[in-house]
Amino acid sequence: MKQHILWDLNNYINQDYTLPKINCTFDIKTNINSSVKEDQEKWILEFFGNSIEKSKKYLGQQTFLIYMFSFPFASPDELKCIFKIMDWAFIIDDFYFESKAKGMSYLEKLFKTNKDKSKDKFIKLFWEIINEYKQIGKKDSIDVLINEIYSWAKSAVQCSKNDQISSNSTLAEYMESRYYDIGIIMALASSTTLISIPKEIRESKIFKQLEYWFVVCNTLINDCYSFNKEKNEPVLTNYVKIKTLQCGSIQTSLDFVAETIENSLTEINNHSNQLIQQYPNNINLKQYIKSLKYLTSGHLHVSSICNRYK
């Protein structure tokens, strides 16, 4: 039976804890195309109607730092598409989804409305960005990106996670509820539109397991490094809180999450190797796995230094 006990930091106020050091076996690299930052700053300024105050506030979250480490091999044109779609997602989530200002009816309109007929800023921008992707990417991979954005947005607007997650949720139950929440599959799809992965591979059991551990790993990275930011909120959309309610110790819970992240990295490696052994001649698959690993190591790195997570 689910126990809907809310988190209350006051119950653990006397506990000291430190964020654990996570041993990542994946390489890390930064993108050399740092000049694209000027394009992002200009785009964000236009997005906020040339409001310097609003654009500075958003840019202060250092999202470009996230992109530089998460997508180290993206070309300037690709990086421009990536920052636009990811910034679009961050902003629409902050403006509409988290505040519950928009629901499923808006979401259906967003994905079905012709941008030329819509007066809504987010709808118009979304399809403009997708059209930019079409200039450089593969149709099937862009379709995957659109589907992943929809899955993320649907998860965000439904907010069903608050009802499904309870204080006695297992990690598997927690992941089932939060699978699309942080948008990590969407982020990977945004950076792999230049390559095509055959349907046979995408639907294989090993590929789905690789994706699962990729999501587990990155969701828990988010939970670990967002805990300080979220610790005063009563909701249980952070596994550190759930584990603490179960065991009584914040430090023990953080250590458990760190250990699970490291185990997830091992699972990612194992399933990656199995896929490459099964499809040894598929160069695109190797590139996809490379992107997945660098996105993970980049996410881990920026989570400890980026203002968006503080």
UniProtKB/Swiss-Prot annotation:
It is an enzyme of class 4 (lyase). InterPro entries: Isoprenoid_synthase_dom_sf, Terpene_cyclase-like_2. GO terms for molecular function: metal ion binding; terpene synthase activity. It catalyses: (2E,6E)-farnesyl diphosphate = (E)-beta-farnesene + diphosphate; (2E,6E)-farnesyl diphosphate = (1S,2S,4R)-beta-elemene + diphosphate; (2E,6E)-farnesyl diphosphate = (3E,6E)-alpha-farnesene + diphosphate. Disulfide bonds: none annotated. GO terms for biological process: terpene biosynthetic process. Its EC number is 4.2.3.-, 4.2.3.46, 4.2.3.47. Terpene synthase that converts its substrate farnesyl diphosphate (FPP) into the sesquiterpenes beta-elemene, (E)-beta-farnesene and (E,E)-alpha-farnesene. Contains several highly conserved motifs that are important for catalytic activity including the aspartate-rich 'DDxx(x)D/E' motif and the 'NDxxSxxxD/E' motif, both of which are involved in complexing metal ions to coordinate the binding of the isoprenyl diphosphate substrate in the active site. This is Terpene synthase 6.
